[in-house]
Amino acid sequence: MEHSSPLAAMQPPSVMLGHCFRSDAPTSYHGFSPLPGLGPGGFNFKDLSMKRSNGDYFGTKVVRGSSPTASLAADLSQNFHIDQSPQVATPRRSLFSACLLGNGNRRGVDDAMTTPPLPSSSPAPAMDIMDMSPLPHKPPFISTPEIELDSPTLESSPMDTTMMSTDGLVPDSPTVLPKDGKQERRRPTFLRPSLARSKAQSFQVGMTRPAPESQGPPFKFQTNGINKTSSGVAASLEDMFGESPQRERPMMRINSTSGLNSRLRPPLGSGSHVRGNGSPSAASVRKSAHPNMRPRKQCRRSLSMYEHPEDVIADSEVSYTSNAPLQSISDFEETQALQLPHFIPEEQADNLPRIDKATLVDIKEGKYDNMFDNIMIIDCRFEYEYDGGHIVGAVNYNDKENLAAELFADPKPRTAIVFHCEYSVHRAPLMAKYIRHRDRAYNVDHYPQLSYPDMYILEGGYSGFFAEHRSLCYPQNYVEMSAKEHEFACERGLGKVKQRSKLSRAQTFAFGQQSPEMEDSPTGRCRNNPGDRKLLASPFNDSPGSRFPGRRMLSY
């Protein structure tokens, strides 16, 4: 076998030497002596192959979308069986036909076998082993009528033809293919787009369709010495491929990415999704991610107030005239600027403005008379302190209720009020805060308007002013609050201050003994007795059905 060529191995046994495999061959040819079991009835290939027909290579059904890897896998899956002979002759097996004859006289064959002369064509019509070889060779001489076969391309295969015929397909493609030399037919197409997408997907995996210009000439067969192509005529590319049919598309949205609903069947005659309609771009079918997935909605929902980008640009060019922003409470309070030079100490939590002694001297000298119509100096000390010595022109008020009744009985605009006590630490700030609280309640319907916006506290009190400006005091004396001779009056006065200022240990909220200024919010409506409102000339007049009943005394 090693001294022979592959062509000698592919030759039929009957073509070699006439006495090679005969039963009556002479014994002198020990290399070609008859093999045991190869008599007329000793070798039955059909029984060995489980009585299955021995098909040729080109008659084998090719797997749809076949490739070299798929062909090899098909051959292996069909021939590897237990206790069975090979079913289908493969190209590689046809090269070694001598393997079927056994290895009994292998040495004699190697010694005596030589390459016989190659005939131009085989006279035996039944010897078709050459047809099973993939090597280029001359077709066998067979006396059959003229037959025209289609070129074996990737578009069509026996498997595809079977599937197309079983699915009830209708012809759609305008491609013309000759049948019996005269009759024309159309290639069938799929009705269901799901099958078309599956076929297109299997075709696209691992291979691409070559361009029509790069394809070789059609496969040729020889009949009676005359070469004919599969089309029967020398057709050009324009004749072989026709234009894809134009189908009417429904009006879709501008932002639509698909012109056809995937859940609806395409109309009959629409073959744009079938790869066998003759169009070079028929195989380029876009497959969805999942066949059973619901299609994405093409409409886009948005919460934007603009439908087009041009609207945003147009609105940016338009100038809007909006109202002035509302000022906050602090802005309104700052608009009523204080007219006297003042300062607010950081260690004090009341945020009430303070003036120094020099400013008070300027007020006494009349430097600010053009700013105010009236300037009041309120002395918050007890009566014995005031009588012992006070600033000239100061008025004594140690009761907050009496001072509020006096001020809001007839409010006077352009009035400045200066509070002071002995040191201006406790009694004067309490008096000033209460007056501001009543002022807010009085002007609750005109917030943030105030009847007395200019309220100040003299820094250092009477003790500091008397030390520097004794001449502006009358009598020019200074009586302290803790004087021994006024000890009883001091205790009585301090009791009133503590009772009205904060809760004491024995007087709790349960008995309603709190100070009136602790009841209300600085910016809320005053909830004092109706008689007090009437006394202060408040807009909340008393009525028979007053909504301010008497306060209930609760105890727990």
Swiss-Prot record:
The highest taxon in the source lineage is: Eukaryota
Name the catalysed reactions.
O-phospho-L-tyrosyl-[protein] + H2O = L-tyrosyl-[protein] + phosphate
Give one GO term, molecular function aspect.
protein tyrosine phosphatase activity
Q: Where is the composition biased (Basic residues)?
A: 287-297
Under Pfam families, the record lists: Rhodanese
Q: Which UniProt keywords apply?
A: Cell cycle, Cell division, Hydrolase, Mitosis, Protein phosphatase
Query: Rhodanese domain: which residues?
Result: 371-474
Q: What is its EC number?
A: 3.1.3.48
Return the annotated region ranges for Disordered: 165-186, 257-297, 505-556
Which InterPro entries would you find in this protein's record? MPI_Phosphatase, Rhodanese-like_dom, Rhodanese-like_dom_sf
Protein's GO biological process: cell division; G2/M transition of mitotic cell cycle; positive regulation of G2/M transition of mitotic cell cycle; positive regulation of G2/MI transition of meiotic cell cycle; positive regulation of mitotic nuclear division
Question: Record keywords: Hydrolase included?
Answer: yes
List the catalytic residues.
C421
Give the GO cellular component terms, alphabetically: cytoplasm; nucleus
Biased composition regions of type Polar residues, renumbered to the chain: 505-516
Top enzyme class of this protein? hydrolase
Q: Which Gene3D superfamilies match?
A: Rhodanese-like domain
**What role does this protein play?**
This protein functions as a dosage-dependent inducer in mitotic control. It is a tyrosine protein phosphatase required for progression of the cell cycle. It may directly dephosphorylate p34(cdc2) and activate the p34(cdc2) kinase activity.
Q: Which family does the record claim for this protein?
A: Belongs to the MPI phosphatase family.
What this protein is called in its record is M-phase inducer phosphatase
Query: Which species does the entry assign this protein to?
Result: Emericella nidulans (strain FGSC A4 / ATCC 38163 / CBS 112.46 / NRRL 194 / M139)
Q: Which gene produces this protein?
A: nimT
